[in-house]
Amino acid sequence: MSDKEDEKQSQPVLKDDKQDQTEEPAIDDNVNGDEGPSDEEEGDDVFDSSEEDEDLDNDEEEAQKVREGFIVDDDEEGGEEDEVVKKKSRRKRRAREEENEALDEDDLDLLMENAGFKRPSASEAAKQRSGKLKRLKRVGDDEEESASAEPESEVARTNKLDDFFSEEEEEEELEDDGTGRAPSRKGVEKTVTLADDMDDFIEEDEFSDEDEEARKFRIAEKKRIKEQRLAQPTQITGLSPDKVDEMFEVFGDGHDYDWALELENEEELDRLEESSENEQDENELGIDSKRKKKLTLQDIYDLQDLKKNLLTEEDMNIRKADIPERYQELRTGLKNYGKLSPEDLELEKNWISDKIAVDKNFDADYDTTEFKEAIGNAINFIQQENLEVSFIYAYRRNYISSRSKDGFVLIEDDLWDIVFYDTEFHSIIYKRDYVKTFYEKLDIHDPIVDEYFSNQSMTELNSLQDIYDYVEFKYAQEINDVLLSTQQDATSKKHLKNSSYEKFKASALYQAINDTGITAEQVGENISAEHQLHPVVDHPSLKPTDSVANILEGPEAKDLQIFSQNPKLALETIEKYYALELSKNPKVRQKIRDDFYKYYIVDVALTSKGRKEIQRGSPYEDIKYALGRTPAHFRSEPDVFLRMLEAESLHLMNIQIHVSSQDQYTNHLFQTSLETSNTSEIASEWNSFRRDAFDSALNKVFSDVSQEIKDELKKTCLRLVTKSVRHQFMFKLDQAPFIPNPKDPKIPRVLTITCGQGKFGSDAIIAVYLNRKTEFVRDYKIVENPFDRKEPELFENALDDIIQHCQPNVIGINGPNPSTQRLYKKIQEIVQKKQIVDNRGSHVPVIYVEDEVAVRYQSSERAAQEFPSKPTLVKYCIALGRYIHSPLLEYANLTNEELLSLSIHSHQSLLTRELFLQALETSFVDIVNLVGIEVNKATDNHYYAKALRYIAGFGRRKSADFLESLQRLNEPLLARQQLITHDILTKTIFMNSAAFLYISWNEKNQRYEDLEHDQLDGTRIHPEDYHLATKVAADALEFDPDAIAEKEEQGTMSEFIELLREDPDRRTKLESLNLEAYAEELEKNTGQRKLNNLNTIVLELLEGFEELRNDFHPLHGDEVFKSLTGESEKTFFKGCIIPVRVERFRHNDIYGVTNSGVECVINAQRHIGAQLKRPAEEVYEIGKTYPAKVIYIDYDNISCEVSLLEHDIRRQYVPIHYSKDPSIWNVEQEMKDQEIEKKLALEEARAKRTHRVINHPYYGNFTGPQAEDYLRSRERGDFVIRQSSRGDDHLAITWKLDKDLFQHVDILEKDKENPLALGKTLIVEDQKYHDLDQIIVEYLQNKVRLLNEITSNEKFKKGTKKEVIKFIEDYSKVNPNRSVYYFSFNYEHPGWFYLMFKINAQSQLYVWNVKLTHTGFFLVNYNYPTVIQLCNGFKTLLKSSSRNKTQDNNNNNSGGYYGY
């Protein structure tokens, strides 16, 4: 495997999202200065080298190559076959072209035989072809044939798209086909229009060097030829002229690209004339110079346009491949798909069985042998035979279900899961094989890795990642060697991964790990076995510190000078890398992973933002205090975990995944793997060392496994929500057309009505009539007001006239607002009053129709193209009528963007776009294949053909290819066998789709004796079962075996089907058959399990393609309410508070309306007017909006009763639909937070109270930020006294230290006479004062004086911390042997100063903190009255600390001296 073939895999990186918090200015309560701000930072790894840092960017590419197998290649490799193209006379046409994916002769014979068809002989086939229009020629066919012509199968083989590039003369297309048929004038007219439109796509003069006159002449000639074509009539057998016209309009006539071909012909002729002599010479030398690059769509159109229309090279390959299109898309990027070893196939069966079994909820003692067999069969059908879900479920059901009647059946949901799991398994196997190859290249033998690859049950990607990380960690040097040996460049880069560990392992310190008494590999085996297979052996004489001391004093310690003065750092380093070895050990990780997956629970930890923002009505309300949630909880409510993840991404909460009693679990693992029972001091210290390393390692593994579980749980929950969305959408699709009379199941004539905005009298009412063929006939505009009290009969008569003229079987209605409900009731009243009945004498039903499709259609591009001159409401009504005829087709004609906008499931927003569309597509596939597609109807009905893409085996590309192939037939399809004989479908696609593509039986077709027209072509019976169906029919008719055998020899078994269809007692005869016994006999003789197929045969012989969908579902009750108002149970419920606009008054009652149009009634007892004994109109105003509480909802009349009383509005009722069981809800934390919220609410109330007024010249009515704004333009030392947010017993002083630097000082008041009075005792920083003036003089003015003293000192430097550090560093470089120190403001903590210093140029920069008090400067537990004393004290401290601590190990860390 070359490096280019291996795909790169990025290692997973865990990131800690930190929430940025903005806080209000804080009151400085730190009096003693013992809580100084810290700038401590973590030091660099002692084994990181500058050499690695310099090469980091360069080496990253090489390091990445090692991991590149962990993402499957997205680009499929494939070669392009060169086609041999030969010129032939323009007066001749090729006899026939063969497709790349066409069946060979043996396959064709076998398939035709299994399907019950008789394949025509070569002469018969030639005769058939002679009566048809010839196919369009390819560009390459214009080249001359050589003397020694190659076989036709090699020369004529080409892509179906080549038919677009025909160079044949236009007159040839008008040739008669022997039956007198020629293209219709109208159809050609439309085709020419399409061609003209395509001509505008690229301007002609950009591709031509001819002069203007020649160009005009050529265009005129082209136009003349087109006009000749328009003058000739056309008729296509079996299709009406209108249908032919529609077909031409949709598909064109194949001449859309003539302009490009004419251009190429002209250029090629010129080129051939100029080079004829050279070609002759080259031909004499045996060189074929006539080969030329064939013009392709890529040469004509922009790539983006080709992608949009699915015409790229990849798209064409998908069209040609004999694999279902959905499978091809799903398997994109998978190498060597379907080439698993027998062991891997068995492994896949068990792996998928375990996953599907969870959904089946089998009992613990259930025998899964038969279940696994069914899973294996399904995998074989999907992977080896490329059969789609719909086919498997319909015609292989006995292979995927239990033999017991009450046993399991793998339903469509399970089969779709198997399809996706199969792809995932192949990806895992590919990655496993990559890691194995990678490991073998290293030429090493590691017991852990060898054991993993010998264990055929290991299929989890996480375990595989452990092995890969382990090899990369432990054998970094070997990887480097392999990389170096495979690099041609002598200056190849190093393998960077774990290079610091390699340096540690090569150092003398590694000996200390050997002294621990047990290796990481032995620990892994102990943990895996759950007891000490390898006992720990303590060092007999040395403690950990002694072992390190010996190493540092030994002869190999010359490279360990950094540790010579700091043995503690050396011990910490050893512990760190020992913990790393433990955390990388696959057995340690696998044991913890197994235990975690069995026992993990999920808790939620709120952030301060989440505690504040998640309130009643929030989408995360039910998970705010989630606790102890198990996998079972998430399987029953998968949206819960997805919403947890969503809330975590918004920084509202953190998800914590752990096992219960995790500390005890860690103790248990340590005791069984690393702890010794010795009680000596040496053993205790080694136990302590090992325990610290073990805890560190397990914390890392816990974190990694928690993240793995989070990712796996997310994947599972997404799958379950996707399945739930799929079920909801299938409910919408699984509706038959509306049938008013079930006894006479005819598609109804439909009249649809809408009132638009519902302004009766000013806005017209629109009605649209559609016939039984779903064709728009005409629209009506009713201007009469249906609620006109003076002349109500005007509207009634107008509507009655329309109904009498159209004779509809059903009236459908809907609209955008609740006014539609009034119209609905009015129409029902008119139907009853006028006795408007159908041909059965029943009243014409008036129904509410779901309008979510109509709303999207009315303003769509499709509607504009179909009805460009019609108003929006007419288009809306047309879509309502189409929905009544077929909800399935209405949804199938929506674009992806329109489908994405549908509201299907309450949690669909949790899914990605891809998963949501996947759910919808699988729903379409299941229902469309349940219903089937009439082939000939699809060829001339673009609206109907939209569902073709969902037929088993098809997709967007193959359905388009299928329609193009049918178009080239130029006649209706008469039998399913023609799908094979005419090379329309390839073998696998035919097997998948044939039974779902039906051809209506027509006795007229019997005149074609060259085809075996079978009545079974109009049933759901698969062609492979035709022979079985004839035998069932013969048995039902009770023919004797000899007669059946005779018919079978004569090949006329289909006569039994005709006889049975004509038999009036066929139902009784078919139902009397013992199908179970027949199926058992069939399985015994042939090994085929066909019981389900036999049941299908019986049902289809009774009625072909019987309607299996659920009845049409008109809207009722709350569904109508939701459709007309847009309200749901979450936005409009009993007890909710809504805004109501007053419309009118009546008898002291108030009538209003909500924003969504719901009419509201407020009776006299539910508004304040009754209490005040005043009329409602004196208290409330018309047009004004008031808050109201919903008391009762009348869904039928789209109205409600509400209350305007204040005490009702204050008590809003929000229903709780979740459990607060203490086992899954953190009740204790909720109560604590509620107490905090109460205190905060009280403080906010205090803050909003009447502002205190203190009689003092410096007191101002400010908040903290307002005080800062006030002082911003004033001088240093200025201040204000203000009210404190801490309550009535606090005041605050805000004073200015420097530009944009302010300190807020808290004043606590004692001995208050009342809450608003000033306290007699005032406390600031534990110092008591008797009034504000004393605080100003003794406290504040002293601080201002000391502030001016330090800022005027030469050792004070203005600027930010970074600016001062840069100044000190620069100074130290210029004066390397001098110490330097400076003070500067601490802008993060007003009232504090930084003291930053360096001993010399080589030392680290240290940062201490100094606090400004009213008596001096506080540094390291001592207060210095002046700056001079502060500087002297600093130097004294520095000298004393230097004697005690000469080496500091923290970069830029004040902790090196006195912990600052």
From Swiss-Prot:
Keyword presence, Hydrolase: no
Claim: Nucleus is one of the keywords in the record: yes
Region feature Disordered, mapped onto this chain: 1-214, 268-287
Ranges of residues in domain SH2: 1257-1354
Compositionally biased intervals (Acidic residues): 36-62, 71-83, 98-110, 141-153, 164-177, 196-212, 268-285
GO biological process, one term: transcription elongation-coupled chromatin remodeling
Function, as annotated: Histone H3-H4 chaperone that plays a role in maintenance of chromatin structure during RNA polymerase II transcription elongation thereby repressing transcription initiation from cryptic promoters. Mediates the reassembly of nucleosomes onto the promoters of at least a selected set of genes during repression; the nucleosome reassembly is essential for transcriptional repression. Essential for viability.
Name of the molecule in the record: Transcription elongation factor SPT6
